[in-house]
From Swiss-Prot:
Record's GO cellular component terms: large ribosomal subunit
CDD domains named among the record's database cross-references: Ribosomal_L10 (cd05797)
Listed Pfam families: Ribosomal_L10
GO molecular function terms attached to this record: large ribosomal subunit rRNA binding; structural constituent of ribosome
Keyword terms of this UniProt record: Ribonucleoprotein, Ribosomal protein, RNA-binding, rRNA-binding
Lineage top rank: taxon: Bacteria
Protein name (Swiss-Prot/TrEMBL): Large ribosomal subunit protein uL10
Species annotation: Zymomonas mobilis subsp. mobilis (strain ATCC 31821 / ZM4 / CP4)
Family under the similarity heading: Belongs to the universal ribosomal protein uL10 family.
Subunit structure: Part of the ribosomal stalk of the 50S ribosomal subunit. The N-terminus interacts with L11 and the large rRNA to form the base of the stalk. The C-terminus forms an elongated spine to which L12 dimers bind in a sequential fashion forming a multimeric L10(L12)X complex.
The keyword Signal is annotated on this UniProt entry: no
Length: 171
């Protein structure tokens, strides 16, 4: 790899890390191309990305940034999963690691916090931002729905009573 390519790769990693809510480091020793392709497509579906980069270049990219603790995790054949949603990359990586033993979670960085394997697994169990937004909208709209039902209930009951009297008089 030429120096210009390395500089470009480091710049790309820096911009990806700046936008990332979480950076998950995985060890992918023995992962086939087909398995890697499946993992990348699952990451893309979740709004995350999965990149294999040289550890030295990744260390240069995180140097002087809040994600600097990440460099402690970069040993051996590693790959980086990033996502703006703090849960997405961790969730996909943990789910894939459960079915494929060749992918090993090393750790992660969320903001300035270094997470170990247990921390990444705990993060993967949290609901995503979209799920949380859906729950909040449901909680906000539930009282309004109940109010509307309560207001409509007496009118419906009156209509049924009048209908019963009309049916009784007709009989």
């Amino acid at each position: 790899m030429e120096r210009a390519q390395k500089v470009e790769l480091v710049a790309g990693l820096k911009s990806a890390f700046a936008e990332a809510g979480v950076i998950v480091v995985t060890r992918n020793l023995g992962l086939t191309v087909a398995q890697s392709t499946v993992l990348r497509s699952k990451m893309r579906e979740a709004g995350a990305s999965f990149k294999v980069a040289k550890n030295k270049l990744t260390r240069i990219a995180v140097e002087g940034t809040p994600q600097a603790p990440l460099s402690d995790l970069l040993t051996g054949p590693t790959a980086i999963a990033t996502s703006a949603d703090p849960v997405a990359a961790a969730k996909v990586a943990v789910e894939f690691a459960k079915t494929n033993k060749k992918l090993e979670i090393v750790g992660a960085v969320m903001g300035t916090t270094l997470l170990d394997i247990a921390g990444v697994q705990a993060l993967a169990e949290l609901p995503s931002l979209d799920e949380l937004r859906g729950k909040i909208v449901g909680l906000i709209s539930a009282p309004a729905t109940k109010i509307a039902q309560t207001i409509q209930a007496p009118a419906g009951q009156l209509a049924r009573v009048f209908g019963a009297y009309a049916a009784k008089d007709a009989a």
